[in-house]
A protein has these predicted regions:
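Short strand-edge motifs at loop-to-beta-strand transitions and within beta-strands
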Residues: 35, 86-92
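Asparagine-centered strand-capping/turn motif at beta-strand->loop junctions
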Residues: 53-57
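Terminal connector regions
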Residues: 100-128
């Protein structure tokens, strides 16, 4: 009888711990997922936009990887964990050199957040005046 109660108690403890862990999650909220640079002069050099990412979850948000869709686009991001209620940054730089005309580029963001991944988009038009 003691053995049955012990096993039952252990099972209940495991279930309660599992449900408590499910409640704790990082929730990444982005101010925007798309940025339009408008017209960019190719001779002006690279342009940068900073996307803000806020952690509205209970545990620290960690952006684990950020991948650009093209070599003309380079990302930089907050590497340290983003505490609950705090905001981090994902800076995306586009180099318009030798790329005249309209463009749309994406950056994939991976994290420990509830959603897991996001796609950010930058777009614009490179002019050669």
């Amino acid at each position: 009888m003691k053995r049955i109660l012990f096993v039952f108690g252990l099972m209940m403890l495991t279930v309660s711990m599992a449900s408590a862990q499910q409640k704790e999650a990082s929730i990444a909220v982005l101010e925007s997922e798309v940025h339009d640079f408008g017209d960019i002069d190719a001779k002006a050099g690279p342009v940068t936009h900073t996307f803000k990412i806020k952690n509205e979850g209970e545990v620290a948000l960690v952006v684990t990887k950020v991948v650009a869709s093209c070599g003309c686009t380079s990302p930089d991001w907050t590497k340290e964990p983003i505490a609950s209620g705090k905001t981090g940054e994902i800076k995306v730089t586009f180099n318009p050199e030798n790329r005249p005309g309209p463009f749309t580029k994406t950056v994939s963001v991976y994290s420990n957040g509830k959603t897991g991944s996001y796609v950010l988009t930058i777009k614009g038009n490179v002019t050669t005046n």
